[in-house]
């Protein structure tokens, strides 16, 4: 399973982006704070169960273990915001994140059960945030009819 964070926006505090899984958009809006930003590159990830909580970890360029996403269970993760701290990567925290997080965690669960390797890639992209929001708004309107 390939997870990609495409970064496209930047300000003095954080970098905006989107999360793509196996070539398809999974979470349309991510925020990554500058004080602990991950360098571009590909990292191998693994899933751990800690009590009732599932956590996806990866090792960064310095060899530090970093948490990527967490949820109390694959089925109830949508109830939580996808906040990843220590690690300062927050998928979907701003725009329609909870539903997307639940789907992503379910997909990760299936990949782990199938013993598939999980790779996370961080890359830079030229896409603008307004394009993302327009894209998702268009899909929403299209679904209505």
Predicted regions and their residues:
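Cell wall/extracellular polymer interaction/catalysis modules
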Residues: 1-145
């Amino acid at each position: 399973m390939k997870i990609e964070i495409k970064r496209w926006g930047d300000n003095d505090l954080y970098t905006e982006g989107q999360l793509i899984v196996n070539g398809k958009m999974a979470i349309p809006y991510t925020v990554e704070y500058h004080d602990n930003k991950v360098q571009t590159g590909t990292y191998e990830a693994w899933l751990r169960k800690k009590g009732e909580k599932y956590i996806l970890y990866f090792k960064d360029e310095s060899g530090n273990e970093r948490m990527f996403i967490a949820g109390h269970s694959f089925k109830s993760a949508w109830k939580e915001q996808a906040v990843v701290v220590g690690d300062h990567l927050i998928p979907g925290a701003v725009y329609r994140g909870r539903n997307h997080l639940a789907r992503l965690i379910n997909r990760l669960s299936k990949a782990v059960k199938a013993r598939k390797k999980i790779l996370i890639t961080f890359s830079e992209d030229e896409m603008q945030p307004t394009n993302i929001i327009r894209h998702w708004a268009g899909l929403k309107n299209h679904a209505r009819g």
